[in-house]
Amino acid sequence: MKLKILGFALLAVCVCAVCCMCGSDSKTPDYEFPDGPDPDPDPQPGDYPAGLTVTEFTDDLGGGKQCLGFVAVADLKANPKLRFNAVHLPQQKTPSRIHAEFASANRGTACVTINAGYWWAGNSLSLLVTGGAVKSIENQTVTRNNQTVYPVRSSFGQMSSGKFETHWIYCVLDDGNKPYAFPSALDNDERTNTYMSAPPTSKTPGAALWTPQEAVGGGPMLVR
């Protein structure tokens, strides 16, 4: 399964390993096994584990300006050791610090970090689930045309079976703000700026409790 990761998440190798290079001043040549396999090549800067590719691209923004972007593609069938993790950040941190803390917590080696949500004044406005625990819920209300409305947002997550799912999500008030999946954005259409005047509930037709192990979400659904 190939996944184009478009959110703030980590792809991490499930096993921790230390790679080191040792040398000495000895003139004695290393012993070579005549029938043994060729040694693995030394890791190079920027190398990623098997199954993970990162492609850099640029795009012209006009006016002599360019943007620099990256596309990360993970093939979990090619490398089952790759893992998708959502990381909750109550405080702002650099990717380097996130990677270091991820490793120090013995969670593996972080390979790619991507922003996957919205925030305002230091507070998350997006759904985030990690280890099956809901750490942040999506912004349940917004103001449009001086009215309070209830947008249903999209989310991307991995289930306990390993399967990935995308759903329209709302954390319902009548079931402790747990995330529920809906078959559509319901009566919300951001293209026409029309929204629901009342929040969906666990009893809304098509509602189903959603229990991912890792998930992020908060905006409109672009690809499914």
Where are these regions (language model features)?
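Zymogen propeptides
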Residues: 29-174
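Bacterial N-terminal signal peptides that target proteins for export
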Residues: 1-9
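C-terminal motif of bacterial Sec signal peptides marking the signal peptidase cleavage site
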Residues: 17-21
